[in-house]
C-alpha cells in the first residue's frame, strides 16, 4: 500500500517575518470537548471555529524575546509511527506570592495552550495563534523560581510545559 498523499511543494516565503511569542493563553483541558472546535473544508490543521462558551481563557503577557513555543516531530521507520511533542517555555518576571499560587494551580491542571506569535497570517494580516495540546493537553513538568544574583539579573519564573500529540 503506497502512502503518497503529498499534494504540493513550497517556495521561499517573504523574508520579513518575526519570531517569538507575544501572549500565552491557557484553558483548562477538560473545559471543552472535541466537538467545540471545527475545521473548514480542506483546512485540516487550521481551526477556524472554537466554541469557548464553557471555558475561560487566561491570558499571560510575556516579556519580549523570552518565551518559546515549538513542536518536535519524532518518527520511527521501523514502527511506521509519527508523533509530535509540543513544548512551551514561558518566562514571567518578578517573584510574587500571587504568581506562585497561580503557578501551583497550573502545575495541578492539564491545559491547552494558545501562543499568539509575533507573526501575522500573510493572506489576512491576522495574528498567528497556534494551539499546543489541542487533542491531549499539556502539563507543566518543570520550572524554576530564580531571584537572580546581580542587580541587573532577572527575578522571576521559568515554566516548562509539554505534551504528546498524534497529529
Model-flagged regions — what are they?
Residues 10-89, 137-152:
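Solvent-exposed edge beta-strands and adjacent loop segments
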Residues 3, 64-140, 149-154, 165-167:
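Extracellular/virion structural assembly segments
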Residues 1-10:
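N-terminal export/ancillary region detector
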Amino acid at each position: 500500500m503506497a502512502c503518497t498523499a503529498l499534494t504540493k511543494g513550497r517556495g521561499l516565503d517573504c523574508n520579513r517575518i518575526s519570531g517569538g511569542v507575544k501572549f500565552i493563553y491557557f484553558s483548562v483541558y477538560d473545559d471543552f470537548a472535541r466537538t467545540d472546535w471545527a475545521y473548514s473544508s480542506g483546512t485540516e490543521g487550521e481551526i477556524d471555529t472554537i466554541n469557548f462558551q464553557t471555558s475561560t481563557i487566561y491570558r499571560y503577557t510575556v516579556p519580549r524575546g523570552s518565551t518559546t513555543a515549538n513542536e518536535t516531530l519524532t518518527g520511527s521507520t521501523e514502527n511506521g509511527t509519527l508523533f509530535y511533542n509540543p513544548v512551551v517555555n514561558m518566562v514571567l518576571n518578578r517573584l510574587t506570592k500571587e504568581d506562585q499560587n497561580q503557578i501551583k494551580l497550573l502545575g495541578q491542571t492539564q491545559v491547552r495552550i494558545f501562543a499568539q506569535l509575533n507573526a501575522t497570517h500573510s493572506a489576512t494580516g491576522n495574528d498567528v495563534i497556534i494551539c499546543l495540546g489541542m487533542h491531549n493537553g499539556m502539563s507543566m513538568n518543570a520550572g524554576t523560581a530564580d531571584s537572580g544574583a546581580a542587580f541587573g539579573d532577572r527575578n522571576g519564573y521559568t515554566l516548562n510545559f509539554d505534551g504528546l500529540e498524534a497529529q
